[in-house]
Amino acid sequence: MIRVFCKNTGTFKEFQEGTMLLEMIDEFDFEKPYPIIAALVNNVPQGLKFRVFNNRDIEFIDYCSYFGRNVYCRSLCFLLYKATLDIFPDCKVMMRRPISKGFYCSVEKGDGTELSDKDIDLIKQRMSEIVAEAIPFHRHEVPIGEAIEVFRKLGHMDKVKLLETCGEVYISYYTLGGTADYYYDVLVPDAGYLKVWDLTPYRGGAFLRVPNRHHPEDLAPFFEQPKTFEVFAESIRWNKIMGLDNVGDVNRACLDGKATDLIQIAEALQEKKIVQIAEEIDRRYRSGNNARIVLITGPTSSGKSTFCKRLSVQLMACGLHPISFSTDDYFVNRVDTPKLPDGSYDFDNFDTVDHDALQKDVMKLISGKTVEVPEYNFVTGIREYNGKKLKLEEGSILLIEGLHALNPKLLDNIPDAGKFKIFINTITSISLDDHNCIPTSDNRLLRRIVRDFNKGAFSAQETISNWPNVRRAEVKWIYPYQEDADVLFNSAYLVEFAVLRSHAERILATVPKNCPEYSEAHKLIKFLHYFIPVSDKQIPPTSLMRYFIG
């Protein structure tokens, strides 16, 4: 017999060795508002068909949990792939990226045509049939060479290249109704669990809608993100030009000694974009509308500060005189900072910034007056005036950088014609393979973990623990204004994960296995193992990446 502790109930129960998680659920009495779809076993995600042979701590999870959503969405992607292949056996399905609270998918049919509305209806019908039949997902753990041959015979060279370079001995792949595919984490037991979804035509492909995070009986709301989509599409075009569709391609290039070339190309592309932005700011300023306020924002760890410095250099090359400050210097004194329900400070709240004082100072600056601007003392938590004075001369451009820079309330007395808005995000365009895209939030979390640790600010455990609060604040305060920007800048780096691996792995290894944060640390370590590590010696000192890795 084995002894299992259920975190959902805080109780122990005994089971026969080898009992499946699926068989344990009803033995524990706890409220289950939504179906249980997976579990954390000793803080490691496992599918419900996982058999337990030793004493373990178990937490059953549904769609409302972070890991539960990942399991559900991953399974939905396989369902879509299976149904599409059943209708169009010679097609190529590519799950491009999460967008608009769903997934954008492109399909290359054998005859070279795009999906029609009728095609999508046929795929939807087949998906519904598979769900109604509750066809099971079967997991197969095999030597990696065997898995490589499975996918080589299927012509899935994206998976072959990934598996050949990941360095594992054994891996698991899944089958659904005889169709094989690879996913880098667990799935639901069968397709019958996937009751809430929709598939609609979108930009020559299909959009896979998923359940609402808080009310999984309903679909998440859809909203257009045309500017974000175009930035992603531009990155995909460049990846194709370089022949780098997936991580396996990047790994091969690094093994062939081309890592330095990839770094230089990534730097050149970012610098080219910054030059274009500077030239557009210059054009607007000199066109007569006197647009001299540049607002720069983006989520945490997107690279705002370094971008601001590099943009300043290019503005000077245009003959302009950039003057910059951060909204952080206008933070209210710490005693006046808004608080979260648990009593901790809500540093990401819009009212953390004294926007009235900031707006008054900006109005004075653009009217030609000299203004003494504050400097926030993060040690004492007090806004200080230390004699720093600013004045806008002829040709001066004011750069304002911060989390809330694009919030329309920040400078609501200044017409939009006088502002140039820039939103920086980390839009990861590279995928593990055709069916496993990489969440942009993972990109930024890894940056944040490395930066916090190197600066001695927080441990990996502390950074991971606070990340849900950061994400909630971004959704509330930052992302609503993304599409309002005049330009979106993508700070994602083609070989970023390969460079971050050597920094992040050792830091993530410090997270104790017995804490809740280990689940995320384990996931990130497993994810980083797909990348061939690349030295950071060729990363230039002015790179956006350098700020995070030191």
Model-derived features: where do they sit?
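Auxiliary tRNA-acceptor-end handling modules of aminoacyl-tRNA synthetases
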Residues: F50-R69, A83, K92-I99, Y104-K272, ...
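Conserved NTP phosphate-binding and transfer environment spanning the P-loop NTPase/kinase superfamily
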Residues: Y285, P408, D412-G550
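Hydrophobic anchor at the beta1->P-loop junction of P-loop NTPases
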Residues: V294-I296
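Conserved lysine of the Walker
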Residues: K304
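Hydrophobic positions on the alpha1 helix immediately C-terminal to the Walker A/P-loop
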Residues: F307, L311
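Short beta-strand-centered segment that lines the nucleotide-binding/catalytic pocket of NTP-utilizing
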Residues: A317-V335
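Conserved nucleotide-sensing/catalytic segment adjacent to the nucleotide-binding pocket
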Residues: V332, D336-V379
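Glycine-rich phosphate-binding loop used to anchor ATP phosphates in small-molecule kinases
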Residues: Q359-A417, W467-Y481
